[in-house]
Amino acid sequence: MNLKLRNIPFSPPDMTEKEAQEVREAILSGWITTGPRTKKLEVQISEYVHTEKAVCLNSATAALEMVLHLLDLKPEDEVIVPAYTYTATASVTQHVGCKLVMVDSQKDNVEMDYDKLAEAITEHTKVICPVDLGGIVANYERVFEIVEQKKYLFKPNNALQAKIGRIVISADCAHSFGANQKGKMAGEIADFSSFSFHAVKNFTTAEGGALTWNLPFGNESVPTDADYMLTVPKKEGETWNELLYRLCQLFSLHGQNKDALAKTKLGAWEYDIIGPWYKCNMTDIMAALGLVQMERYKGILERRYEIVRRYDEALKDLPVAVLNHKGSDHCSSHHLYLVRLLGRSREDANKVIEQMAERGIACNVHYKPLPMMTAYKALGFDIKNYPNAYHLFENEVSLPLHTKLTDEDIEYVTSNFVDIIKNL
């Protein structure tokens, strides 16, 4: 075992001089808010995940909430999320004022229990939010099967919901940018997909996120008299993809019908406020980071694959369970390395985290289930109703996984972890 103390942070951003130079150029260009770099990054993201459009925002949370606004949900409408996730998946329901429904995990699997998901669907269910936890694409085939089976319960409230014709699948892809399943990229599989580009993510714009969608009718024209977003004037010949993109711009910029870039044209000062909406746009400084990260992302992912391979090899003889990041039909983004200490308690797992910290290695936990959190207890959720989610949490430890790790760092992490587990 390597006894020389090292300092191993959990997930620092991987920045180079290239990102610094692009940010400098953005600042000196005089265009630091939403502008040409943001628009360029949107195009690159849509091309990367094979969708017609992408909208850059300031977080995945904003993207997840944007979906609920685009669907124009009502207070009685229900959104189903897993209990085993980060708060953003669920909190957006409270932002828009609809009803939150939680479903337990599968036994020994971080995905939702799909049988329980089917049971949770009612005539009020409008959206299901699967989570690509750790960067592993969820079983969307199963989710689509379930919503087709429950199609008879679906009652649309507007023209967009009616056009979709069933419960909407809004993927929480905060972890899975760059992941794929059965030849499709995260971002093109679900109806709507929300990505996070936060500083701890594989691909980062410091803060930031993006929304993509893939609707079979996206290139069809929207009837000018469509019963949908009645305060927003419809344009003759505008497609659903174009309208949704325009709505995202409105929702992210106070409902203002001209962004700063459009207002730079001579005599184009005048604008209207279509709705009293939000401020969650991406800036060109953030996008500058993203443009360079896109150039580097293939290499970033490949290094993550190698780190996970080395972790798997080092831990293979321990009494632990880890996520399956790569298989014949899928490849995750390799965002998190979750380790469950089989037969151990939360207290045992906490001891491991403390002992790793004493050796300079930062670990984490993904996740404490939402029904254990104060905010969700106050909404009436009880962890006793989500035993599988609790079982996943009770002995979980996340090891550092990032591209600043050297081969020597990986050896240091794994040798210390193995030593601590064997002496626990």
Tell what function each PLM region has.
Residues 15, 33, 85, 108-109, ...:
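Glycine-/small-residue-rich active-site loops that bind phosphorylated ligands and cofactors
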Residues 206-210:
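Glycine-rich phosphate-binding loop of ATP-grasp-fold ATP-dependent ligases
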Residues 69-173, 180:
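PLP-dependent aminotransferase-like
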Residues 80, 101, 168-170, 194, ...:
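Structural detector of well-ordered beta-strand residues that form the stable sheet scaffold
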Residues 56, 81, 102, 211, ...:
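Conserved SAM-binding loop
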Residues 157-205, 236, 269-273, 322:
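Conserved active-site segment immediately N-terminal to the catalytic lysine
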